[in-house]
Amino acid sequence: VENMKYSNLNDGIDEYLKKYEDTFYVSNLDFAIDLIRTGGKKFNLRNTTNYNAENQCFEEKVSGVETLDLVTSFLAELDGDYLQCFTKSFNEGRFDFYNDLENNDKKIRGICSYEGYTVNFNGTISDSRTIIHEFFHSLNIKNYKLAPIFSEMISIFMENKFLDFLNTKGYSRNDIAKSRLARYNDFSGAWNRLIIQSNFLNLKNKIGYLDEESYDFISMHEKELNFPHLSKEDFIEVLEFLDDRIKNSEKIEQAFNPEYSFRYYIGTIYSSYLLLQEDSLDKVLLLNEYLRKPVEETDIESAFRIIGIKDETDFRFI
């Protein structure tokens, strides 16, 4: 295979499939792809926002002390031990602030352990929002079975609730809006990459080696393969692009990582859905507590039921 065309692409995807075969995403590829496609049509993800560099500038300055006060004040309003957990984590050094220069230093970035989080300090509300997001990850990330599915949803939901909290405290509504837009712009920008990589991952998993010669077979069996119609020119263009990206990357995940992108997709879609429900905060906190249980005491069906998703019809609410 090494001497065959597109060997980087094929070998790389084979490696990826083997590494992630037990994940929810890879184990349910056709189902995941249907969700991604439906969401793209429903929300017109190619044109969700018009967010550019000018929109990223926040107006209101927030000091480091004020940032921590905001985080602790928000957590204190939640039922449970969240404030105590954050205080303990912070005092143990699991959250650190760095500026842009320090964050780009490999030595400093390497200091961050698996359970540590660095916050690129900007002196704006984005700092406290990031802390809230990463803090909730830290609470449930050890549940290797369910965290890949639910952790992003919980963190994105809670960061939005935190932005609601900032609004009640009189912080800049423009900055709050920009902060929300940043999340959804990132989401819409990643969607196109996610659907392309998912389609080709699924195709590789079903038919084996991908190259120009496989196009005719694929085009004849698009429905059975759950693969969208592409011209041969577009098909080859994607093959060449992915092959080159994988060839020039040290790790497959640097060039091709749809499982990771899928977490953000599910997290953004379902957190947005839950934000429309009045009792959603209670549901999400209950789900977070469920993920904090020993892994062997949790299962995916129970987790979905906690947030009101009882069957496939509910799951496909979009």
Give names to the regions the model predicted.
Residues V1-G116, K310:
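Contiguous, non-catalytic segments that form substrate-binding/exosite surfaces or channel walls
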Residues N167-A255:
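Long, amphipathic alpha-helical stalk/connector segments used for oligomerization, subunit docking
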Residues S113-I131, N143-L146:
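Short pre-active-site segment immediately N-terminal to the catalytic Zn-binding motif
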